[in-house]
């Protein structure tokens, strides 16, 4: 089914987007071998149904739990650092050949070439996707819950499972005689689009539904930065602190929408790095790769600090340095686990974070005397302590709004990208309530006694049920275990590429294979050693969060999106939008400088 794309930057209508549906069993996996032509090897191999594939309440069909898990896995794979600054598009080996991960059907830097899969025997070739006269008359229209009516094309290949005479049951199951009874069977959908440069490329269509995108967005935004929000509110005071939180939430929501508009200028753009290249060329992509590296490094360090501080508060006889060293032996093994498993483990991270917030709130209601009580709040301040602390609060209060690095990927992964703005609205409503609520509750409970991590206050305050102390420590221990490996993976991939060991040639000698595997192991261990060493030398959690917020969040979430919009949408931007973007950039540069300076000086 053709679908009209938005207007291009020069105002003309772009070519239509053609969608082609290829039947498959959704509970399938890709073969690693691109060369074979048997159905189970050249496309999709059936596997046993997981318990997650079965409908559970509202979680059924395209929103089944297995689809949520797969969508989360794709979202986690979007966090990557690109070394090839000259590459116009992130996930293309050639000008019109996208690469993807066979397990998640997500774009991947080192994935399988889409053309190889489509060009295997019995598959619609890329050149056929827009040439209906070459497609068999057996093509039919099917209906998908999210895509709507889509052209389902087959090629007249008598030896193919997708031959025109094959029944729908055969196409779905790989053989005759089996009834089409699985409600979770559908199709892989590819689309053929024309970029602003006139090149026609074939891409995988987005797969995530709106609820899945909202879930992935919340998972990106709600992190350990919210644990430092009460301290930020203490530094800024009620008046300025709450005002800054509201402004940061609104501003980052608006810039996320600007990124969405920038993506609409060219349907072949997929990632944040693609926007950087489109706006500033190779230098833009290189800058973004450097920023992403710093962001991942800072996140990994802050997780190690959180681990050490939380256990030290529970077991003060052991130093924070001791627990940081212990964290190395705990977070290093998961780095060797496949992404499919890590993605499921990462769910524990957001569950632990939200669980911690709920526990803290319950503790405040349980305790009747201050400090640590919502019934009898501590004394608080309306205005900042001093100018230095006000500047430090800038980074603390802005760090929790940084999800823009993966927002472009989340939009392009949607079945209906036009719903992305509505998803953002829901995401920011939930995130704003969580973040602002945590800041207010923490500040009321501990007032001017609040520490860099609100959990540390709870662990050091007497009067709560005994199990609370162990529970919070356990939750704070789970978060680094769940998230540190995901922060390390992109940096490890960079080291593997630099050392040319990202792929081990099985045809090489045994010595070379062992050396390559040894380097891969070394890289994974080395990154975690770096996390721990930096955490030991820079042990203050609030300073790390303030630096990430003021230095990186302002750049990635406010300055660059406005700059992208000014460059990529210059022919359609309204005058007031141009002024607003320039004002936002100027104010962000000033606030970022003040915040970074305060974090370094303090």
Curated annotation (Swiss-Prot):
Q: Write out the GO cellular component annotations.
A: fungal-type vacuole; fungal-type vacuole membrane
Q: Which domain of life is it from?
A: Eukaryota
Q: Which GO terms describe its molecular function?
A: L-glutamine transmembrane transporter activity; L-histidine transmembrane transporter activity; L-isoleucine transmembrane transporter activity; L-tyrosine transmembrane transporter activity; neutral L-amino acid transmembrane transporter activity
Query: According to its UniProt record, what is one Pfam family this protein matches?
Result: Aa_trans
Q: Which residues carry this modification: Phosphoserine?
A: 8, 15, 35, 187
Q: Which UniProt keywords apply?
A: Amino-acid transport, Membrane, Phosphoprotein, Transmembrane, Transmembrane helix, Transport, Vacuole
Write down the membrane topology.
Answer: Multi-pass membrane protein
| The keyword Phosphoprotein is assigned to this record | yes
Result of knocking out the encoding gene: Decreases glutamine, tyrosine, proline, histidine, and arginine import into the vacuole.
Give the reactions, separated by semicolons, that this protein catalyses.
L-histidine(out) + Na(+)(out) + H(+)(in) = L-histidine(in) + Na(+)(in) + H(+)(out)
Q: Which residues, renumbered to this chain, carry the PTM Phosphothreonine?
A: 181
Q: What does this protein do?
A: Amino acid/proton antiporter that moves various amino acids into the vacuole, with a preference for large neutral ones and histidine.
Q: Which family does it belong to?
A: Belongs to the amino acid/polyamine transporter 2 family.
Miscellaneous comment in the UniProt entry for this protein? Present with 1820 molecules/cell in log phase SD medium.
PANTHER family found in the cross-reference section? AMINO ACID TRANSPORTER, TRANSMEMBRANE AMINO ACID TRANSPORTER FAMILY PROTEIN
Task: Please identify the protein, giving its name as recorded.
Answer: Vacuolar amino acid transporter 1
Gene source species: Saccharomyces cerevisiae (strain ATCC 204508 / S288c) (Baker's yeast)
């Amino acid at each position: 089914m053709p679908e009209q794309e938005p207007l291009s930057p020069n105002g003309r209508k772009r070519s239509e987007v053609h969608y082609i549906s290829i039947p498959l069993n959704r509970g399938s996996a890709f073969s690693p071998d691109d060369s074979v032509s048997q159905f189970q090897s050249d496309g999709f191999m059936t596997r046993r149904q997981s318990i997650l594939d079965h409908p559970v309440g509202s979680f059924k069909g395209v929103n089944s739990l297995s689809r949520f898990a797969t969508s989360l896995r794709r979202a986690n794979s979007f966090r990557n650092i690109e070394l090839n600054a000259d590459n116009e598009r992130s996930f293309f080996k050639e000008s019109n050949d996208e690469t993807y991960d066979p397990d998640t059907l997500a774009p991947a830097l080192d994935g399988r070439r889409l053309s190889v899969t489509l060009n295997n025997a019995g598959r619609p070739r890329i050149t056929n996707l827009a040439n209906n006269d070459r497609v068999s008359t057996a093509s039919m229209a099917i209906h998908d819950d999210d895509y709507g009516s889509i052209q389902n094309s087959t090629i007249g290949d008598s030896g193919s499972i997708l031959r025109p005479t094959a029944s729908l049951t055969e196409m779905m199951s790989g053989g005759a005689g089996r009834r089409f009874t699985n409600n979770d069977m559908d199709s892989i959908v590819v689309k053929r689009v024309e970029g602003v440069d006139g090149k026609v490329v074939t891409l995988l269509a987005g797969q995530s539904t709106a609820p899945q995108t909202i879930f992935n967005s919340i998972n990106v935004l709600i992190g350990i930065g919210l644990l430092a929000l009460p301290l930020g509110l203490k530094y800024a005071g009620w008046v300025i602190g709450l005002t800054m939180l509201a402004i940061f939430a609104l501003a980052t929501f608006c810039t996320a929408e600007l990124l969405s508009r920038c993506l609409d200028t060219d349907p072949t753009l997929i990632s944040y790095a693609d926007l950087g290249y489109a706006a500033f060329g190779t230098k833009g992509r290189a800058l973004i790769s450097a920023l992403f590296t710093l962001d991942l490094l800072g996140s990994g360090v802050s997780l190690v600090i959180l681990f050490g501080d939380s256990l030290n508060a529970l077991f003060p006889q052991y130093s924070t340095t001791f627990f940081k060293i212990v964290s190395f032996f705990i977070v290093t093994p998961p780095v060797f686990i496949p992404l499919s498993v890590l993605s499921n483990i990462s769910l524990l991270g957001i569950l632990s974070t939200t669980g911690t917030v709920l526990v803290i709130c319950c503790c405040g209601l349980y305790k009747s005397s201050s400090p640590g009580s919502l019934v009898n709040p501590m004394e608080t301040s309306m205005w900042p302590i001093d100018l230095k602390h006000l500047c430090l609060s800038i980074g603390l209060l802005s760090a929790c709004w940084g999800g823009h690095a993966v927002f472009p990927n989340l939009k392009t992964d949607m079945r209906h990208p036009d719903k992305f703005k509505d998803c953002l609205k829901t995401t920011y409503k939930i995130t704003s309530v969580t973040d602002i609520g945590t800041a207010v509750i923490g500040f009321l409970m501990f007032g001017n006694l609040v520490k860099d991590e609100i959990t540390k206050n709870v662990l050091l305050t007497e009067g709560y049920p005994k199990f609370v102390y162990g529970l919070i420590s356990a939750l704070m221990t789970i978060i680094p275990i769940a998230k540190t490996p995901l922060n390390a993976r992109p940096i490890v991939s960079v080291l593997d590429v630099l050392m040319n060991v990202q792929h081990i040639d099985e045809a090489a000698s045994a010595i070379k294979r062992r050396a390559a595997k040894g380097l891969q192991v070394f890289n994974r261990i080395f990154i975690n050693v770096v996390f721990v060493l930096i955490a030991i030398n820079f042990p203050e959690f609030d300073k790390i969060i303030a630096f990430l917020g003021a230095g990186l969040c302002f750049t990635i979430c406010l300055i660059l999106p406005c700059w992208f919009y000014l460059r990529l949408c210059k022919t359609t931007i309204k005058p007031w939008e141009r002024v607003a973007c320039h004002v936002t950039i100027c104010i962000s540069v000033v606030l970022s400088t003040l915040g970074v300076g305060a974090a370094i000086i303090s």
